[in-house]
């Protein structure tokens, strides 16, 4: 593992200058998309920086300079940075701890790729003073003797030195219920940018899992919100747009410092506290809790050899971190409050990963005063899981022997534990009031939601649907985007297969029976489900109780998924 650089300075004057400069430079997501082709933008999303380097090589546009420097991790002359950030300047960047001066040799090595892309060789401002002409070779000279009592002279610094970024800094745009937002978010540089393994206390930027949680978070106005395991603080920035008070916690002191920096840079008030899970907010309760906890199931043998990556490994045995979050959350939730989290869980070899995956999660939720919607969006066998997470932490930089040692040790741990698969998904909880809790919580488990990832309103609806009115006395309304597809054997009057499609919402496609199709088709908000079921029974010459038994569970699923509303 590598050693982390010091965290950015929380100097609000300098941070204010940086904010003014990035705004003035139009360093926004929209402008970045104008500077780069769709292909280069897509490559950046895959952590491939070379296409963007090719397209931005040699450009003096301030947004291009800042993109090369902070996102593509290319050295820049201090003068170029001062032109891009005229209020802060290169000296201010260095004072904030966002950049450092490097020597010509380090700069030349890092710039090899960009020069191969066609970028002109950028010289110091005064060539004659800083560059020895090739036609005038320097004569050898005798070393100068210095008095031992004399202080050593300060090392010479070039008038226009090269600088390199110490952090990733990039624009991030969001359209939320309260309007459009443009933020700038700092995080630690990744191994793709540095070519080095991650430090133990690495603070991750905005990755795919982060975006998933951001998309699925309920964005209703609340008085208070909590981000557990805040990392770079992006979840907390989003929460601040619709919560009167936001608290962000993290076990990592480094993550807390970077969250504080990002809050200051984006002029947002966030109460940042260091500590494990809910310990920093003991005795407090919130209307909304979000968490992308360090859930990767990591054995002690791997931690001992490679270190504990704080951003993904909470240090607990097996998947007990998820259990700790679920069991501890209700005490920190107001009645009616919501928890949303991403999670991994182990599935024993003795259980089917498609039909019995929820057993472990269900045991954790047993007896809690909550309703729960749990979705397993993917399932991996242990070998694929191990390979994915080793590569995530820079496995491509490992020596073959080190990679194989870590892989076999990790896989052997899963075998000893009897783990047959690892489920990956999300959990949404709603805290019950005293009367609801007396009768116990409702829980729904869904496997591999196809279509779209759920958005906040989809999650809110799914949780609310667990407390839907008595089905048979309820008049349901079919969503306007629901369509039906029927498959027939040639010459047959009855369909062999009926598939119901959802255009919006979760975008699901669900096989249904003829009876379910008939009920959905007749659900226009006028007749109750009981009345429609009786009509279907009469038309098909089937007992009404048999029709009810056939349609009850599928209708509850269709309600939860948004095909039907009440």
Can you describe what each PLM-predicted range is?
Residues 62-114, 153-168, 214, 231, ...:
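Long, charge-rich, low-complexity alpha-helical segments
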Residues 77-78, 83-120, 128-202:
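Non-catalytic substrate-recognition/targeting regions of SAM-dependent transferases
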Residues 181-217, 495-497, 509-514:
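Class I S-adenosylmethionine
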Residues 251-252, 317-376:
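Conserved Class I SAM-dependent methyltransferase catalytic core
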Residues 253, 293-324:
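Mobile active-site "lid"/loop adjacent to the S-adenosyl-L-methionine
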